Structures are given as C-alpha cells and as structure tokens.
Amino acid sequence: ADGSDPASSDFLAEGGGVR
C-alpha cells in the first residue's frame, strides 16, 4: 500500500505495493 510498486496494485486497489 506504499504506492511504489505498481506490480502489486493488482491485489492492492489503492495502487501501490508492499515493500
């Protein structure tokens, strides 16, 4: 949910990924 990893946005609809 950080927003820095767009590849994770497929499971985080807030548009970010966990780092």
UniProtKB/Swiss-Prot annotation:
Gene Ontology BP terms: adaptive immune response; blood coagulation; innate immune response
Top-level taxon: Eukaryota
PTM section of the record: Conversion of fibrinogen to fibrin is triggered by thrombin, which cleaves fibrinopeptides A and B from alpha and beta chains, and thus exposes the N-terminal polymerization sites responsible for the formation of the soft clot. The soft clot is converted into the hard clot by factor XIIIA which catalyzes the epsilon-(gamma-glutamyl)lysine cross-linking between gamma chains (stronger) and between alpha chains (weaker) of different monomers.
Keyword annotations: Adaptive immunity, Blood coagulation, Coiled coil, Disulfide bond, Hemostasis, Immunity, Innate immunity, Secreted
Main location group: secreted
Functional description taken from the UniProt entry: Cleaved by the protease thrombin to yield monomers which, together with fibrinogen beta (FGB) and fibrinogen gamma (FGG), polymerize to form an insoluble fibrin matrix. Fibrin has a major function in hemostasis as one of the primary components of blood clots. In addition, functions during the early stages of wound repair to stabilize the lesion and guide cell migration during re-epithelialization. Was originally thought to be essential for platelet aggregation, based on in vitro studies using anticoagulated blood.
Quaternary structure and interacting proteins, as annotated: Heterohexamer; disulfide linked. Contains 2 sets of 3 non-identical chains (alpha, beta and gamma). The 2 heterotrimers are in head to head conformation with the N-termini in a small central domain.
Protein name: Fibrinogen alpha chain
